[in-house]
Amino acid sequence: MSGTNPGEADGGAADAVLIAGPTASGKSALALSLAERTGGIVINTDSMQVYRDLRIITARPTPDEEARVPHRLYGHVDADVNCSAGMWVADAAAALEEALAQNRLPIFAGGSGLYFKALTRGLSAVPPIPSQVRDDVRARLERDGAEALHAVLARRDPAAAQRLKPRDRARIARALEVVEATGRSLTDWHRDGLPPLLPPDKVRAIFLAPDREALYARIDARFGAMLAAGALEEVRALAERHLDPLLPAMKAHGVPALMRHLRGEISLEEAAEIGRADTRHYAKRQFTWFRHQLPEFRWTSPEEAEAQLSCVIPGPR
């Protein structure tokens, strides 16, 4: 696999390991294995696995797996919270400080590119906006109009709303995208950004890149396994809370389709196929995003990943 990593440092030990990759590529299992071998702490770097209500449908580590080594930032946020990248960075900073204070290797594992980017580059003054947030805001713009979104912006970012005319469609949408994606106003981002948590030359960063067809087959099989493990009941409990459908937890892959099934709109088989297709499309986007946004990550097959990490971290710390 191609790719370079500024943190390789002639085989020296890294201050932290970053394990990224598309959904269902084996990141959690690799992180668990590495943590057991090194006495490390696994730190969640996935925007959906932070939610307490969604263990099954987001493929969080099982309670047994979490008991084997310390896990942080898994299921620590309620579904009624919009956990922004800025909130995650603050939580990740505390988890990183804990790991280093205990002389444990911090192992960041997940699939959220913006979170990994924040670790080694910080959050920029004008952060990249996830396509899901952007598409949602643009759909609301078409449905409700610029003046309605301007009223929403006045509550979320009053300073930006005051600067913008109520019919300035593009700038209103941009300001609202930023505050909804990050939890910080565009005004704040223009003033300052968040610094990186880790020096890029002191980390070992890999991207698990399985064979595409094998990955898609695994995604399809895993969705069926989730249903067998109780994913529908998990989503039913979430639906009974009657939360805002625009909250991130309500849009996790598989959740909207299963909620449609619970409302009697589609069959369970149709919901499962929609969930599988959405997850496959997400995996494709993850490949593309990491290739262009974080080229310093070393791409490797899951089979080669253990050896890649063993070269840098030969034994317990």
UniProtKB/Swiss-Prot annotation:
Keywords: ATP-binding, Magnesium, Nucleotide-binding, Transferase, tRNA processing. It comes from the Bacteria. Substrate binds at T23, A24, S25, G26, K27, S28. Its cofactor is Mg(2+). Residues 46-49 are annotated as: Interaction with substrate tRNA. Catalyzes the transfer of a dimethylallyl group onto the adenine at position 37 in tRNAs that read codons beginning with uridine, leading to the formation of N6-(dimethylallyl)adenosine (i(6)A). This is tRNA dimethylallyltransferase. The lineage of its organism: Bacteria, Pseudomonadati, Pseudomonadota, Alphaproteobacteria, Hyphomicrobiales.
